[in-house]
Design a protein with these regions (language model features):
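Pyridoxal 5′-phosphate
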Residues: 89
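Catalytic cores of secreted/periplasmic lytic hydrolases that degrade extracellular macromolecules
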Residues: 1-83, 92-168
């Protein structure tokens, strides 16, 4: 009788609270299929355009939505945070680094042979401002930095806690 009760409890728990790892694997496979499907029908990286603030924000939102297809739900960064940072760092895409190097966040590279040198600095500077092929590529790199660098570990803890609270 005790064994039957334990089995019933285990079944109930498994039914209403599925295995976390299995759930993640299923979500990852579904996301991979969605990405493949989107690319098959011609869904491509959107172009971030600069003109008015509204245009910049709308095209940033499209880029973020596109990049979110590649990310697991728990790795996504709030749109408002990304857009606000891009507006502050690049003057809504109008800065020299945004115009010439597609860098919306002032991301640096520690390679003297790559990137852009800020005006007024000499070649002795040990870093450069990283250049990208597209503005959306700089958004991808910014998301990667927030998701991987030790400096943003506390941010990730807070995001994970909020995702848990809101069921994301």
């Amino acid at each position: 009788m005790a064994i039957a009760g334990i089995c019933l409890i285990g079944f109930g728990i498994g039914t209403f609270y599925p295995n976390y790892i299995s759930k993640i694997n299923i979500e990852e496979k579904a996301a991979d299929k969605t990405i493949l499907w989107a690319k098959e029908i011609g869904f491509a990286e959107p172009r971030i355009t600069v003109g008015s603030d509204e245009e910049f924000i709308k095209t940033m939102q499209k880029c973020i939505a596109y990049l979110n297809l590649e990310l697991h739900k728990g790795e996504r960064i709030p749109d408002d945070l990304i857009i606000a940072q891009a507006i502050i760092e690049s003057n809504a895409g109008l800065s020299r680094f945004a115009r010439e190097g597609n860098n919306l966040f002032g991301i640096r590279v520690w390679n003297k042979d790559a990137g852009m040198l800020p005006h007024g600095y000499t070649d002795t500077l040990s870093w450069r401002v990283k250049s990208y092929n597209t503005k959306c590529a700089s958004v991808r790199d910014y998301i990667k930095i927030l998701n991987t660098k030790q400096a943003y570990a506390e941010f990730r803890k807070i995001r994970d806690k909020q995702n848990k609270w809101y069921g994301k």
